[in-house]
Swiss-Prot record:
This is Elongation factor 2. The lineage of its organism: Archaea, Thermoproteota, Thermoprotei, Desulfurococcales, Desulfurococcaceae. Catalyzes the GTP-dependent ribosomal translocation step during translation elongation. During this step, the ribosome changes from the pre-translocational (PRE) to the post-translocational (POST) state as the newly formed A-site-bound peptidyl-tRNA and P-site-bound deacylated tRNA move to the P and E sites, respectively. Catalyzes the coordinated movement of the two tRNA molecules, the mRNA and conformational changes in the ribosome. PANTHER family: ELONGATION FACTOR-LIKE GTPASE 1, TRANSLATION ELONGATION FACTOR-RELATED. Residues 18-261 form the tr-type G domain. The modification Diphthamide is found at residue 602. GO terms for molecular function: GTP binding; GTPase activity; translation elongation factor activity.
Length: 736
């Protein structure tokens, strides 16, 4: 009955926003996020006390239990009492492995605070910094939990003094990151002060923890904890009673994480660029339960019994079953069939969920992560939420086919569902070879997806060796080329040139988008990237790989009628470039003039697409074409004596050492290395450091492949795709 009673209690408290907190737990892989979540669940009576710390209740996929890492973000609503008052804490546990970082960035959008978990032994690592930065960019307030303190006592046998020094170092590093990445008004305000209780220390596995004020109040001395560990395992219950972990962490959350009404006031201007003085804007700023319904979807799951479940935060209004809503991005109406809240893998039904809370919804089967849901009558007044920025990009691909050809329809269906749940997995069909291509953030991401296909859909698949995804680009301007339609009745005059770095970063960061107000976009491009006025005003399209189509024509007859076809032709040409049929990145395509046939029958897609493609391809092949390869940033920590070995490995793999820092007897090496060179990196690093290196990696940027390797690489990619090894020449597309 505990769960039922709690659900009823929780639904009641959810109406009073002062008693609600929306938080996430985020950390580097293996620093103990999910174990912390479990200890919090045990305290809320959702899993038994005995198995907490080992249960990994939020890791409810078998894959996660076995690997001991979180793959998806899981949600739960917890009940907690602080100073005699009940609170609801909506908790999201997010993945820490870099291959799953897209899930973490999506979770940041719907929470107001984050518990940053740092391993006391490993300290601040790459992903710690990456996720803290993502949180601060979304104006999510951090608190800190320093975990695995038991390892400092038992394994490293540090004295209380040394342990304290370790704590001071970690807090200092986290505060430096807050000062570096937080918006101006929060740089000082959000600095963490252990004396105030903004940092908790403890062991999630052994389920104890304390903050400085709590230790003072209860008379706990650190030497008491060290003494209890000397007594061995049987002393743990005493320690758990003395310093209950959930009390330390959840009291800290209630005290320092703002409630949804407070948080939306300063978070909304950052994540929503609509008119804050409009009816919708005011309702969201006030988190008004009686305002127009607005919900932001941050996650979708396929439930084998119920179909698609969309999870998200209600920013204003009240979400009720049976109501019709408008999906802004999908541009369609759908009906809310069921509203519920999450208790780990369970969904508990609710009649309604009010603004400021996290809800799970059935019925919105066309919703995807990032969708803005609004009451139907406001559909024409709603500006969608800002696009979510992903930390990584899909850089590794495998070709897959079912072992049994009869399973092909089943595989297509499973891949479709998988790409809905995880938008950072990209599924494509190679039209020429009929292969299904699955692209992900890294080898582990792909591996988990394949395991998922086998275990959830019973599909045995054959997968190729992982292939690196490249991008095609150019380094020079081309002259204007004439692209003719096959029937010779339509002619398009097109040139190409590389986009400058500033424009690329404006598009990548979501500051410039295809569907923003053209005048506003032109202003930003002129002022920030130095675009000429005529070009800045006349952008027709921006595709997902950061290519831009500009129309500089004047007075061309019938051009309006074929505009959409030309844009579609541009998108198709950018999907597969001329050099190796890899996606194109960072190219500006300019239409200078055109002759279009007056009869619609002579200017259909079959005529316009080839004209667009041929002119673009010829232009690219004369503009110093190249391939870009994905580069990863590495952050390695190892004992000082292995520095030489690590440097040798990185330089052999075409890597570059960016920085070497000495932290006591430990060297921290920041480096960059091409993804193509990382497949056996883990084994090599372990071998060269006797297993003592710890490291994290994240996607850094795209960089041109060295000229000495370019032609050979192009030939290899073309051969793999069943194309002629030699790249085409401009005259293959345009009659000179």
């Amino acid at each position: 009955m505990v769960r039922y009673k709690q659900t009823m209690e929780i639904l009641k408290i959810m109406r009073n926003l002062e008693q609600v907190r929306n938080i996430g737990i985020t950390a580097h892989v293996d620093h103990g996020k999910t174990t912390l979540s479990d200890s919090l669940l045990a305290a809320a009576g959702i899993i038994s006390e005995k198995i907490a710390g080992e249960a990994l209740a939020l890791d409810y996929l078998d894959v996660e239990q076995r690997r001991g890492i979180t793959v998806k973000s899981a949600n739960i609503s917890l009940y907690h009492e602080y100073k005699g008052k009940p609170y609801v804490i909506n908790l999201i546990d997010t993945p820490g492995h870099v291959d799953f970082s897209a899930k973490t960035t999506r979770a940041m959008r719907v929470i107001d605070g984050a518990i940053l978990v740092v391993d006391a032994v490993e300290g601040v690592m790459t992903q710690t910094e990456m996720y803290l930065r993502a949180a601060l960019e979304e104006r999510v307030r951090p608190v800190l939990f320093i975990n695995k303190v038991d390892r400092l006592i038992k394994e490293l046998r540090l004295s209380p003094q040394e342990i304290q020094q370790r704590f001071v170092q970690i807090i200092k590093e986290v505060n430096q990151l807050i000062a570096m990445y937080a918006d101006k008004e929060f740089k000082t305000k959000w600095q963490l002060d252990p004396a105030k209780g903004q940092v908790a220390f403890g062991s999630a596995r052994d389920r104890w923890g304390f903050t400085v004020p709590m230790a003072k109040q209860k008379g706990i001395k650190f030497s008491d904890i060290v003494d209890l560990y000397k007594k061995g395992k049987e002393a743990l219950p005493e320690l758990q009673k003395l310093a209950p972990l959930h009390e330390a962490v959840l009291d800290m959350v209630v005290k320092f994480i703002p409630n949804p009404r407070e948080a939306q006031k300063y978070r909304l201007p950052k994540i929503w660029h609509g008119d804050l003085n409009s009816e919708i804007g005011k309702a969201m700023l006030e988190t008004d339960p009686n305002g127009p319904l607005v919900m932001l979807v941050n996650d979708v799951r396929i439930d084998p019994h119920a179909g698609l479940v969309a999870t998200g935060r209600v920013f204003s209004g009240t979400l009720r079953a049976g109501e019709e809503v408008w999906l802004v991005n999908a541009r369609m109406k759908q009906k809310v069939l069921q509203v519920s809240l999450y208790m780990g893998p369970y969904r508990e039904l609710a009649d309604e969920i009010v603004a400021g809370n996290i809800a799970a919804v059935l019925g919105l089967d066309k919703a995807r992560a990032g969708e803005t849901v609004v009451a139907v009558e406001y559909k024409d007044m709603m500006t969608p939420f800002e696009k979510l920025r992903m930390i990584s990009e899909p850089v590794v691909t495998v070709a897959i086919e079912p072992k049994n050809p009869r399973d092909l329809p089943k595989l297509i269906d499973a891949l479709h569902k998988l790409s809905i749940e995880d938008p950072s997995l990209v599924v494509r069909i190679n039209e020429e070879t009929g292969e299904y291509l699955l692209s992900g953030m890294g080898p582990l991401h792909i591996e988990i997806a394949l395991t998922f296909l086998k275990e959830n859909y019973g599909l045995d698949v054959i997968a190729s060796q992982p292939i690196i995804v490249y991008r095609e680009s150019i380094r020079d301007k081309s002259r204007v080329f004439e692209g003719k339609s096959p029937n010779k009745h339509n002619k398009l005059y097109i040139s190409v040139e590389p986009l400058d770095e500033k424009t690329i970063s404006l598009i990548h960061d979501g500051i410039i988008t295809e569907d923003m107000d053209p005048k506003q976009r032109a202003k930003v491009l002129r002022e920030e990237a130095g675009w000429p006025t005529d070009q800045a005003r006349r952008i027709w399209a921006i595709d997902e790989n950061i290519n831009v189509f500009v129309d500089l024509t004047t007075g061309v007859q019938h051009l309006r009628e074929v505009k959409d076809t030309i844009i579609q032709g541009f998108r198709l040409a950018m999907r597969e470039g001329p050099l190796a049929m890899e996606p194109v990145r960072g190219v500006k395509v300019i239409l200078h003039d055109a002759i279009i046939h007056e009869d619609p029958a002579h200017r259909g897609p079959g005529q316009i697409y080839p004209a667009v493609r041929n002119a673009i391809y010829a232009g690219m092949l004369t503009a110093k074409p190249t391939l870009l390869e994905p580069i990863q940033k590495l952050d390695i920590k190892a004992p000082m004596e292995y520095l030489g070995n690590i440097t040798t490995i990185i330089t052999k793999k075409r890597g570059k050492i960016l920085q070497v820092l000495q932290q006591g007897a430990v060297a921290r090496i920041i480096a960059e290395i091409p993804v193509a060179e990382t497949f056996d990196l883990a084994e090599q690093l372990r071998g060269a450091t006797a297993g003592k290196a710890i490291w994290g990696q994240e996607f850094s940027r795209w960089a041109p492949v060295p000229d000495s390797m370019l032609l050979d690489l192009v030939r290899k990619i073309r051969e793999r795709k069943g194309l002629k090894p030699e790249p085409p020449r401009p005259e293959d597309f345009i009659g000179f």
